[in-house]
Curated annotation (Swiss-Prot):
Its main location: membrane. Binds 1 FMN per subunit. One of its GO terms (cellular component) is cytoplasm. GO terms for molecular function: dihydroorotate dehydrogenase (quinone) activity. Keywords: Cell membrane, Flavoprotein, FMN, Membrane, Oxidoreductase, Pyrimidine biosynthesis. The active site is at S175. It comes from Serratia proteamaculans (strain 568). Its cofactor is FMN. It holds the Pfam family DHO_dh. FMN binds at A62, G63, L64, D65, K66, T86, N139, N172, K217, T245, G268, G297, Y318, S319. Monomer. This is Dihydroorotate dehydrogenase (quinone). PANTHER family: DIHYDROOROTATE DEHYDROGENASE (QUINONE), MITOCHONDRIAL (PTHR48109:SF4), DIHYDROOROTATE DEHYDROGENASE (QUINONE), MITOCHONDRIAL-RELATED (PTHR48109).
Length: 336
């Protein structure tokens, strides 16, 4: 592919402008004879996870295609599954710009996007138009102006709307960019949320005559005790899977680099080791009682294999994909 040249041009632009431009072009070629420019053939390597059959174990992590605008394009590149979102009940513009920064020397990104999205109804319309043959995950969150105490209502609204169209639903309680959101990972707040989500899942299962698994996405910045408590809650509430991890607030690996002081969540290579360690600790705690989807800094075949060796059943990429391009999908799926 021509990605090194494309990347050079895109990296001259503001990161958010580069993202918009890329999505414009992907929408332009998808479903036309020009789709060959992005299509890659990858081997089928089926994986069974959460009761679903995945074509291969590599997925696109949430956050890149928040509104489900380019699902078919990412499918054409060879992803076994695509996770869209995070989406909220109502549209919201997110935090003030600039809010996305490349840490080029470290192959990392810092973002404080703040769940900018066009709302769950718009996402559902985009999903209905897509023809992706893989598993579609839909990642849901709460609106910024919804008080944390009422946050679970936002998740239940989104579940209602996405359930008929989702392969699985991801519950995002770990973004550092929505005030108070991470507090939902702890103690009674977590138990209350998970109980409500399982009740809603049961209700929707009966209504739609299909079972859509639910996975919870957690942060990397957790103490041993917090991780043990989260694992215990996930098991007690019969949650179907856990996605580990979201972005980190830790900056120790990027000290002195451009933009290192910017607020927001850090992803990419600087997150690689810490997210793998969370997966390893989580796997020891869970003992196979629910599967782990590993994400955080995967930028090579070896990084993907490390996540799986630590206990992940599936893996996802985002920042590594920005820095390495579609070839990374092929490299991982071919040899994982």
């Amino acid at each position: 592919m021509y990605y090194p040249l494309i990347r050079k041009a895109l990296f001259q632009l503001d990161p958010e402008r580069a993202h918009e431009l890329t999505f414009q072009q992907l929408r332009r070629v998808t479903g036309t004879p020009l789709e060959f420019l992005i299509r890659q053939s990858v081997p089928t390597k089926p994986v069974s996870c959460m009761g679903l059959s995945f074509k291969n174990p590599l997925g696109l992590a949430a956050g890149l295609d928040k509104d489900g605008e380019c699902i078919d394009a990412f499918g054409a590149m060879g992803f076994g599954f695509v996770e869209v979102g995070t989406v909220t009940p109502r549209p919201q513009s997110g935090n003030d710009k600039p809010r996305l920064f490349r840490i080029v020397e470290a192959e990392g990104l810092i973002n404080r996007m703040g769940f900018n999205n066009q709302g769950v109804d718009n996402l559902v319309e985009n999903v209905k138009k897509s023809h992706f043959g893989g598993i579609l995950g839909i990642n849901i969150g709460k609106n910024k102006d919804t008080p944390v105490e009422q946050g679970k209502d936002d998740y239940l609204i989104c579940m209602d709307k996405v359930y008929p169209y989702a392969g699985y639903i991801a519950i995002n309680i770990s973004s550092p960019n929505t005030p108070g959101l991470r507090s939902l990972q702890y103690g009674e707040a977590l138990d209350d949320l998970l109980a409500a989500i399982k009740n809603k899942q049961q209700e929707l299962h009966e209504r739609h005559h299909k079972y859509v698994p639910v996975a919870v996405k957690i942060a990397p910045d957790l103490s041993e005790e917090e991780l043990i408590q989260i694992a215990d809650s996930l098991v007690r509430h019969n949650i179907d899977g856990v996605i580990a991890t979201n972005t980190t607030l830790d900056r120790k690996l990027i000290q002195g680099l451009n933009y290192c002081e910017q607020m927001g969540g850090l992803s990419g290579r600087p997150l690689q080791a810490s997210s793998t360690e969370v997966i390893r600790r989580l796997s020891l705690e869970l003992q196979g009682r629910l599967p782990i989807i590993g994400v955080g800094g995967i930028d090579s075949l070896m990084a993907a294999r490390e996540k799986m060796a630590a206990g992940a059943s599936l893996v996802q990429i985002y920042s590594g994909f920005i820095f390495k391009g579609p070839r990374l999908i092929k490299d991982i799926v071919n040899y994982i």
